[in-house]
């Protein structure tokens, strides 16, 4: 963040909603990723799959957002809540009745960044610093969801995004993207 803290995320995506825009064949939230190009045949196959996908009762997106900032328990809970905004940027619809979406948050407090405190050294971070951490949490979780989709490989069952692509490439970022 602008305050010198790091925020990173990790996501495992098996959602009912789609992370892919059926009109373009690209992720809803492309962020810093470069999606593999899809041939017209690949795009048609992807659209057919998205239309036919019935969903199941066993879907979820699960993830972790972590920071080196010294957050308290309530602030960590808020960071986990706000990370769901990133999920909603990357997957549509998000939080369906068939999803068990859950994001956890941890704060190590190991950053050397400090703020001048006039009275008590245990005082919480300034609200502006916390808000910047929350913004970063949503951003990196959206990036992480996109990265999970673009880097996944098939092991049988539903195909992975790469199965529809000509090649895979990315520029910057990744499932562990950090701010």
Identify what each model region corresponds to.
Residues 1-179:
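A structural signal for small-residue-enriched, beta-sheet-centric alpha/beta enzyme cores
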């Amino acid at each position: 963040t602008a305050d010198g803290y790091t925020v990173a995320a990790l996501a495992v995506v098996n959602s009912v909603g789609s992370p892919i825009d059926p009109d373009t064949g690209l992720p809803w939230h492309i962020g810093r990723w470069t999606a593999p190009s899809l041939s017209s045949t690949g795009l048609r196959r992807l659209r057919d799959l998205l239309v036919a996908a019935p969903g199941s009762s066993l879907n979820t997106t699960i993830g972790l957002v972590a920071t080196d900032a010294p957050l308290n328990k309530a602030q960590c809970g808020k960071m986990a809540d706000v990370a769901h905004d990133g999920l909603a940027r990357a997957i549509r619809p998000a939080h369906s009745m068939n999803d068990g979406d859950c994001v956890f948050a941890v704060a190590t407090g190991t950053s050397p960044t400090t703020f001048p405190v006039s009275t008590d050294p245990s005082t919480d971070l300034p609200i502006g610093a916390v808000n910047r951490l929350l913004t970063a949490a949503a951003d990196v979780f959206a990036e992480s969801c996109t990265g999970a989709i673009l880097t996944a490989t098939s092991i049988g069952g539903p195909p992975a995004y790469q199965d529809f692509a000509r090649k895979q490439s990315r520029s910057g970022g990744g499932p562990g993207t950090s701010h």
